[in-house]
Amino acid sequence: MSDRSVHPVLCAALLTLSALAAVPAFAQDGDPILEANGVKYACAGVGKASRGDPRWPAFPVRLEFAAANGDFLGDPAVTVTDGGGKPVFSAQCNGPWVLIELPAGSYKVHATGQKGQYAKDFDIAVKVGGQTKKTIRLP
């Protein structure tokens, strides 16, 4: 092979490798998946890219926090207890969506917004497969 034919092949290989190296960095730029007490969760929903993140449908629970006028609230705190009253999850988020990886079952949720100024208690039922979605409107 001559020097002239090696150069384009080498350039193409380097370009491909640099593109592949950029993919993991791009994938990590989104909202992080966190963990509290062994439960995976994410705080998301700020911006179109976050709301369209393909990872979110895999979470069995999606709680969306909004004001009475429909605007998103970005500071929810959530505590989830199981049917026996045992706390299984608690977190403070900086985005209006709280996505939680809970096993199937019935849970009680205590949620606060606007730095604890408003609170709401409600039940959720998590089924096997699919996503339980609840919009919580706080005045």
Language model segments and positions:
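N-terminal signal peptide c-region/cleavage motif recognized by signal peptidases
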Residues: 22-24
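Bacterial N-terminal signal peptides that target proteins for export
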Residues: 2-13
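Surface-exposed loops/turns
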Residues: 103-104, 128
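Short, surface-exposed beta-strand/beta-hairpin micro-motifs centered on an aromatic residue
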Residues: 95-101
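General secretory precursor processing signal
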Residues: 14, 44-47, 96
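Primarily secretory-pathway and cell-envelope proteins
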Residues: 26-76, 80-81, 113-139
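Short, acidic Ser/Thr/Gly-rich low-complexity loop/linker segments typical of extracellular
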Residues: 85-95
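A short tyrosine-centered beta-strand micro-motif
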Residues: 105-111
